[in-house]
Amino acid sequence: LSASKARESFARAAKEYVFRGDSTQAIRLLDMGLEKLPPQQIRYTDANTLPFIEGYYMAGAPDKGDGLLMSYARNLMQYIDYYLDFQGIQGDMVTQTLIDKMQSLDRLYYLAAYMGRQDVLAQLNDYYRTLGIYENELIHPDLSTPSDSVQIPE
């Protein structure tokens, strides 16, 4: 069993505790999983990190979910900024890696939006603006209706 899979197991078990109504035990398991197998030892991946973020949100520990989400997001931003500096053939060689990192950041972005994490969205919006993303393409946390949804009259 790889260390990454072991970390995923903590999140799976924690979610089961949430479904059973024991959020305290779920948070304890999530904390233990990150303590025993921290991101400094096991690099962030969507598979071994998103379940922890979701678990914290589901268990009623949004601050812990936000902290982990932003830590992973900052890690992705560093990679993205690094790969954006590559030019020519080197740039071509890292294109798929850059796309993968952007997709991971997008998943975090949409998770934050889905969970209604306004402060996190605001921070991620600031970063997306540095990449040249237009304002109308961003999710605005202060608006009750996203720009890509339709209001149906009653």
Model-predicted regions and their roles:
Residues L1-E154:
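C-terminal luminal/periplasmic domains and tails of membrane-associated envelope-modifying transferases
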